[in-house]
Amino acid sequence: DCASGPCCRDCKFLEEFTICNMARGDDMNDYCNGKTCDCPRNPHKWPA
């Protein structure tokens, strides 16, 4: 399925909702989508 990337392990996509980028500050965690090797950005922020 994939060769490398934060959402790829052993040439397979990681499962959907696997955390690929931990939250920092008011940002929320980013999760693998189970379809790509990239780590899609979560557009949401924690409420102020």
Swiss-Prot record:
SMART domains: DISIN
Domain Disintegrin: 1-47
Record-linked InterPro entries: Disintegrin_CS (IPR018358), Disintegrin_dom (IPR001762), Disintegrin_dom_sf (IPR036436)
UniProt protein name: Disintegrin leucogastin-A
Disulphide-bonded residues: 2-11, 7-32, 8-37, 20-39
Additional notes on this entry: The disintegrin belongs to the short disintegrin subfamily.
Function comment: Inhibits ADP-induced human platelet aggregation.
Record localization: Secreted
Chain ranges for the short sequence motif Cell attachment site as given in the UniProt record: 24-26
Record's keyword terms, sorted: Cell adhesion impairing toxin, Disulfide bond, Hemostasis impairing toxin, Platelet aggregation inhibiting toxin, Secreted, Toxin
Tissue spec: Expressed by the venom gland.
Record carries keyword Glycoprotein: no
Domain of life per record: Eukaryota
